[in-house]
Amino acid sequence: MPVAVGPYGQSQPNCFDRVKMGFMMGFAVGMAAGALFGTFSCLRFGMRGRELMGGVGKTMMQSGGTFGTFMAIGMGIRC
C-alpha cells in the first residue's frame, strides 16, 4: 500500500506510530481520571499520608494502563 502524502509533502504516520500515540493519549487521560477517582476513593477509606499517595498512585497507574490499552487497540483497528 503506498504511503499517503499530506499537504506540503508531509507523510502520514505509520500504523505503529498511531497505535503508540493512541496508547500515550489514553494513558494520559486514564492517569487524570485515576487521580480524581483514586483520591476520592482513598479519602473515603480514611487513608492519610504515605498510604494515600501509594493508593492514589496505584489507581492512577491501573486506570492509565487500562485506558491506554483500549485506546491503542482502537487506533490499531483504525489502521
Curated annotation (Swiss-Prot):
Q: Which Pfam families match?
A: Romo1 (PF10247)
Instruction: Name where it mostly resides.
Output: mitochondrion
- UniProt xrefs under InterPro entries: Romo1/Mgr2 (IPR018450)
- Extract the ranges annotated as region (Sufficient for antibacterial activity): 42-60
Coiled-coil features, chain-numbered ranges: none
- Which BP terms does GO give this entry? cellular response to reactive oxygen species; defense response to bacterium; positive regulation of reactive oxygen species metabolic process; protein import into mitochondrial matrix; protein insertion into mitochondrial inner membrane; replicative senescence
Cellular component per GO? Answer: mitochondrion; TIM23 mitochondrial import inner membrane translocase complex
**Key words, A-Z:** Antibiotic, Antimicrobial, Membrane, Mitochondrion, Mitochondrion inner membrane, Transmembrane, Transmembrane helix
Localization, per the record, is:
Mitochondrion inner membrane
Q: How does it sit in the membrane?
A: Single-pass membrane protein
Residue ranges crossing the lipid bilayer per the database entry: 23-43
Q: Which family does it belong to?
A: Belongs to the MGR2 family.
Described by its record, this protein's role is as follows:
Has antibacterial activity against a variety of bacteria including S.aureus, P.aeruginosa and M.tuberculosis. Acts by inducing bacterial membrane breakage.
Protein name according to UniProt: Reactive oxygen species modulator 1
Species the sequence originates in: Xenopus laevis (African clawed frog)
Name the gene.
romo1
